[in-house]
Protein backbone atom coordinates (compact mmCIF):
# COMPACT_ATOMS: atom_id res chain seq x y z
CA UNK A 1 0.00 0.00 0.00
CA UNK A 2 1.43 3.36 -0.96
CA UNK A 3 1.45 6.36 1.37
CA UNK A 4 -1.42 8.15 -0.37
CA UNK A 5 -3.67 5.08 -0.04
CA UNK A 6 -2.67 4.68 3.60
CA UNK A 7 -3.59 8.30 4.31
CA UNK A 8 -6.94 7.81 2.53
CA UNK A 9 -7.71 4.65 4.50
CA UNK A 10 -6.84 6.17 7.86
CA UNK A 11 -8.71 9.39 7.08
CA UNK A 12 -11.83 7.50 5.99
CA UNK A 13 -11.89 5.51 9.25
CA UNK A 14 -11.40 8.67 11.31
CA UNK A 15 -14.14 10.54 9.43
CA UNK A 16 -16.49 7.60 10.03
CA UNK A 17 -15.58 7.38 13.72
CA UNK A 18 -15.30 11.08 14.62
CA UNK A 19 -17.17 12.98 11.93
CA UNK A 20 -15.65 15.60 9.69
CA UNK A 21 -15.13 18.44 12.16
CA UNK A 22 -13.66 16.33 14.97
CA UNK A 23 -11.11 14.64 12.71
CA UNK A 24 -7.85 16.54 12.69
CA UNK A 25 -5.03 16.44 10.20
CA UNK A 26 -2.74 15.74 13.16
CA UNK A 27 -4.62 12.50 13.90
CA UNK A 28 -4.52 11.51 10.25
CA UNK A 29 -0.77 12.14 10.07
CA UNK A 30 -0.08 10.24 13.30
CA UNK A 31 -2.17 7.15 12.49
CA UNK A 32 -0.99 6.99 8.88
CA UNK A 33 2.62 7.32 10.05
CA UNK A 34 3.05 10.18 7.63
CA UNK A 35 3.79 13.89 7.85
CA UNK A 36 1.75 17.02 7.29
CA UNK A 37 3.97 17.70 4.31
CA UNK A 38 2.96 14.38 2.72
CA UNK A 39 -0.70 14.94 3.54
CA UNK A 40 -0.72 18.38 1.98
CA UNK A 41 1.40 17.25 -0.96
CA UNK A 42 -1.20 14.65 -1.93
CA UNK A 43 -4.38 16.53 -0.99
CA UNK A 44 -3.59 20.24 -0.41
CA UNK A 45 -6.39 20.56 2.20
CA UNK A 46 -8.49 18.45 4.55
CA UNK A 47 -11.47 19.32 2.34
CA UNK A 48 -9.74 17.89 -0.74
CA UNK A 49 -8.83 14.74 1.19
CA UNK A 50 -12.47 14.26 2.19
CA UNK A 51 -13.68 14.88 -1.37
CA UNK A 52 -11.17 12.32 -2.67
CA UNK A 53 -12.61 9.75 -0.26
CA UNK A 54 -16.13 10.55 -1.49
CA UNK A 55 -14.98 10.21 -5.11
CA UNK A 56 -13.47 6.81 -4.39
CA UNK A 57 -16.66 5.65 -2.66
CA UNK A 58 -18.74 6.94 -5.58
CA UNK A 59 -16.56 5.08 -8.07
CA UNK A 60 -16.94 1.84 -6.09
CA UNK A 61 -20.70 2.37 -6.05
CA UNK A 62 -20.86 2.98 -9.81
CA UNK A 63 -18.77 -0.13 -10.50
CA UNK A 64 -21.08 -2.22 -8.37
CA UNK A 65 -24.11 -0.79 -10.17
CA UNK A 66 -22.62 -1.59 -13.58
CA UNK A 67 -22.18 -5.23 -12.54
CA UNK A 68 -25.65 -5.52 -11.01
CA UNK A 69 -27.74 -3.81 -13.69
CA UNK A 70 -26.99 -6.45 -16.32
CA UNK A 71 -29.37 -8.73 -14.39
CA UNK A 72 -32.29 -6.50 -15.40
CA UNK A 73 -34.41 -6.93 -18.52
CA UNK A 74 -36.44 -3.73 -18.17
CA UNK A 75 -35.88 -0.24 -16.86
CA UNK A 76 -38.61 -0.86 -14.30
CA UNK A 77 -36.44 -3.69 -12.93
CA UNK A 78 -33.41 -1.37 -13.01
CA UNK A 79 -35.28 1.24 -10.98
CA UNK A 80 -36.23 -1.31 -8.32
CA UNK A 81 -32.72 -2.76 -8.21
CA UNK A 82 -30.98 0.62 -8.13
CA UNK A 83 -33.14 1.72 -5.22
CA UNK A 84 -32.68 -1.53 -3.34
CA UNK A 85 -28.94 -1.45 -3.96
CA UNK A 86 -28.82 2.12 -2.64
CA UNK A 87 -30.48 0.85 0.49
CA UNK A 88 -28.62 -2.40 1.06
CA UNK A 89 -25.14 -1.13 0.24
CA UNK A 90 -25.95 1.94 2.32
CA UNK A 91 -24.43 4.15 -0.35
CA UNK A 92 -22.27 6.49 1.76
CA UNK A 93 -23.88 5.67 5.10
CA UNK A 94 -20.75 5.09 7.17
CA UNK A 95 -19.64 8.58 6.14
CA UNK A 96 -23.13 10.10 6.39
CA UNK A 97 -22.53 12.17 9.54
CA UNK A 98 -19.22 13.47 8.21
CA UNK A 99 -20.88 14.31 4.89
CA UNK A 100 -23.63 16.29 6.64
CA UNK A 101 -21.06 18.24 8.68
CA UNK A 102 -18.93 18.87 5.63
CA UNK A 103 -21.91 19.79 3.48
CA UNK A 104 -23.31 22.35 5.91
CA UNK A 105 -19.96 23.98 6.64
CA UNK A 106 -18.16 23.97 3.30
CA UNK A 107 -20.89 23.81 0.68
CA UNK A 108 -20.93 27.62 0.58
CA UNK A 109 -17.59 27.91 -1.22
CA UNK A 110 -17.76 27.75 -5.00
CA UNK A 111 -15.06 25.14 -5.52
CA UNK A 112 -16.50 22.77 -2.90
CA UNK A 113 -20.03 23.43 -4.15
CA UNK A 114 -18.96 22.47 -7.66
CA UNK A 115 -17.27 19.26 -6.51
CA UNK A 116 -20.23 18.21 -4.34
CA UNK A 117 -22.66 18.90 -7.19
CA UNK A 118 -20.54 16.75 -9.48
CA UNK A 119 -20.76 13.85 -7.00
CA UNK A 120 -24.52 14.29 -6.55
CA UNK A 121 -25.05 14.46 -10.29
CA UNK A 122 -23.45 11.04 -10.80
CA UNK A 123 -26.18 9.53 -8.64
CA UNK A 124 -28.92 11.53 -10.37
CA UNK A 125 -27.48 10.63 -13.78
CA UNK A 126 -28.12 6.94 -13.13
CA UNK A 127 -31.81 7.71 -12.68
CA UNK A 128 -31.71 9.87 -15.79
CA UNK A 129 -30.42 6.93 -17.84
CA UNK A 130 -33.07 4.59 -16.43
CA UNK A 131 -35.91 7.03 -17.10
CA UNK A 132 -34.68 8.04 -20.55
CA UNK A 133 -34.28 4.41 -21.65
CA UNK A 134 -37.70 3.62 -20.19
CA UNK A 135 -39.16 6.41 -22.32
CA UNK A 136 -37.48 5.01 -25.42
CA UNK A 137 -38.73 1.49 -24.66
CA UNK A 138 -42.29 2.69 -24.02
CA UNK A 139 -42.29 1.69 -20.34
CA UNK A 140 -43.48 5.16 -19.34
CA UNK A 141 -43.77 8.65 -20.76
CA UNK A 142 -41.82 11.25 -18.81
CA UNK A 143 -41.76 14.77 -20.20
CA UNK A 144 -39.16 16.17 -17.80
CA UNK A 145 -36.62 13.39 -17.21
CA UNK A 146 -34.25 15.77 -15.38
CA UNK A 147 -36.82 16.76 -12.76
CA UNK A 148 -38.10 13.21 -12.26
CA UNK A 149 -34.52 11.96 -11.86
CA UNK A 150 -33.81 14.55 -9.16
CA UNK A 151 -37.06 13.74 -7.37
CA UNK A 152 -36.33 10.00 -7.40
CA UNK A 153 -32.73 10.46 -6.19
CA UNK A 154 -33.76 12.70 -3.32
CA UNK A 155 -36.69 10.51 -2.28
CA UNK A 156 -34.50 7.40 -2.24
CA UNK A 157 -31.78 9.23 -0.32
CA UNK A 158 -34.39 10.24 2.25
CA UNK A 159 -35.61 6.66 2.64
CA UNK A 160 -32.05 5.36 2.95
CA UNK A 161 -31.12 8.00 5.52
CA UNK A 162 -34.23 8.07 7.68
CA UNK A 163 -34.87 4.33 7.92
CA UNK A 164 -31.33 3.36 8.86
CA UNK A 165 -32.25 2.13 12.35
CA UNK A 166 -35.00 -0.18 11.05
CA UNK A 167 -34.70 -3.88 10.26
CA UNK A 168 -33.23 -4.43 6.77
CA UNK A 169 -36.20 -6.51 5.62
CA UNK A 170 -38.61 -3.74 6.62
CA UNK A 171 -36.43 -1.19 4.86
CA UNK A 172 -36.38 -3.25 1.65
CA UNK A 173 -40.15 -3.69 1.84
CA UNK A 174 -40.58 0.08 2.25
CA UNK A 175 -38.19 0.83 -0.63
CA UNK A 176 -40.00 -1.60 -2.92
CA UNK A 177 -43.34 0.01 -1.99
CA UNK A 178 -41.87 3.41 -2.84
CA UNK A 179 -40.60 2.09 -6.18
CA UNK A 180 -44.01 0.63 -6.98
CA UNK A 181 -45.90 3.83 -6.13
CA UNK A 182 -43.37 6.02 -7.94
CA UNK A 183 -43.38 3.96 -11.13
CA UNK A 184 -47.15 3.52 -11.11
CA UNK A 185 -47.37 7.29 -11.22
CA UNK A 186 -45.19 7.30 -14.35
CA UNK A 187 -46.81 4.42 -16.21
CA UNK A 188 -48.68 5.02 -19.42
Swiss-Prot record:
The keyword Transport does not apply. Keywords: DNA-binding, Plasmid, Repressor, Transcription, Transcription regulation. GO terms for molecular function: DNA binding; DNA-binding transcription factor activity. Residues 24-43 bind DNA. PANTHER family: ACREF/ENVCD OPERON REPRESSOR-RELATED (PTHR43479), ACREF_ENVCD OPERON REPRESSOR-RELATED (PTHR43479:SF11). Transcriptional repressor of qacA. Binds to IR1, an unusually long 28 bp operator, which is located downstream from the qacA promoter and overlaps its transcription start site. QacR is induced from its IR1 site by binding to one of many structurally dissimilar cationic lipophilic compounds, which are also substrates of QacA. This is HTH-type transcriptional regulator QacR. The lineage of its organism: Bacteria, Bacillati, Bacillota, Bacilli, Bacillales.
